[in-house]
Curated annotation (Swiss-Prot):
Residues at which a divalent metal cation binds: 89-90, 185
Annotated catalysed reactions: Endonucleolytic cleavage to 5'-phosphomonoester
Role summary: Endonuclease that specifically degrades the RNA of RNA-DNA hybrids.
HAMAP family assigned: RNase_HII_B
Gene3D superfamilies, per database record: Ribonuclease H-like superfamily/Ribonuclease H
Gene Ontology molecular functions: manganese ion binding; RNA binding; RNA-DNA hybrid ribonuclease activity
Name by which UniProt lists this protein: Ribonuclease HII
Alphabetical UniProt keywords: Cytoplasm, Endonuclease, Hydrolase, Manganese, Metal-binding, Nuclease
GO cellular component, one term: cytoplasm
Cofactor or coenzyme needed: Mn(2+); Mg(2+)
Pfam families: RNase_HII (PF01351)
Length: 269
């Protein structure tokens, strides 16, 4: 849209144009958008000025996200620019039902800014919709990724601590490339024959760990939704096997299912 004669353009058309910018914005358009904001802010119409202010706020949020994302990439790159670095994280340590799942992800940490994956953070801080969107992007852009699980029966037989470590180990060892370094969240992965550094609150600092947490959570949540089709009385589609009041009452009423962790139910049954 040509904004040279802005005063002759109807508000609704300008708003559509502004909404389109927000939807399709890319890093390379930053200077162009700044020029548009300047023109909107000079328009005599208050509603058009508000569009300019909203667009400026959008751009500021984008710049904040760019900085946050770059910090997460740089956190991993500090271990070595030419290293293949895998992030690994698990989900499902605490639920009463279902497997524990881990994902390992190797990203290209040296891509240009505009090719980086934005909005990645601890999977628990993202909406379900955003996690699903990022899951697709991470899988497409990753050099390699792998998902592993340990089922409820093994958790009962070997214990959750062993299962937690084992699932992280399997996720890393199943990668199609061998990383030079593995970054894990919170604690080291035992018996891993690759250099490993553990990061406290790693899913909020490391782009590789945060990416793995997203893939693991999306995979497990979708698996529990599938189980819910067969075992709908437990509400797995929305509690993912965690011990909500509704879930606990269902266990007391219907008994445990084939995917429940019996070792986790001693205070319920």
């Amino acid at each position: 849209m040509n904004l040279n004669n802005l005063e002759n353009i109807r508000y609704n058309e300008i708003k559509e144009f502004s909404d389109k910018i927000k939807k399709e914005f890319t890093f390379s358009q930053e200077k162009q958008v700044m020029d548009i904001i300047e023109k909107l802010n000079k328009d005599p119409r208050k509603n058009v000025i508000k569009l300019g202010q909203a667009l400026e706020k959008f751009l500021n949020k984008y710049e904040e996200e760019l900085k946050r994302t770059n910090n997460m990439y740089n956190f991993d790159r500090r271990y070595g620019n030419n290293y293949l670095i895998a992030g690994v994280d698990e989900v499902g340590r605490g639920p009463l039902a279902g497997p524990i799942v881990a994902a390992a992800v190797v990203l290209d940490l040296n891509v240009e800014e505009m090719q980086r994956i934005f909005n990645i953070k601890d999977s628990k801080k993202l909406s379900e919709k955003k996690r699903e969107e990022l899951d697709i992007i991470i899988r497409e852009k990753a050099i390699s990724y792998n998902i592993a699980l340990v089922d409820n029966k093994t958790i009962d037989e070997r214990g959750i601590s062993w299962s937690n470590n084992e699932v992280l180990k399997r996720a890393v060892e199943g990668l199609k490339v061998k990383p030079d370094l593995v970054l894990s969240d919170g604690y080291a992965v035992k018996n891993l024959n690759i250099r490993n550094e553990f990061i406290i609150k790693g899913d909020s600092k490391s782009i590789s760990i945060a990416s793995s947490s997203i893939i693991a959570k999306v995979y497990r949540d979708n698996m529990m939704k599938e189980y819910s089709k067969e075992l709908n009385m437990y509400g797995f589609n929305h509690n993912a096997g965690y011990g909500t009041e509704e879930h606990v009452q269902a266990i007391k009423k219907y008994g445990p299912s084939k995917i429940h962790r019996m070792s986790f139910l001693t205070n319920i049954l």
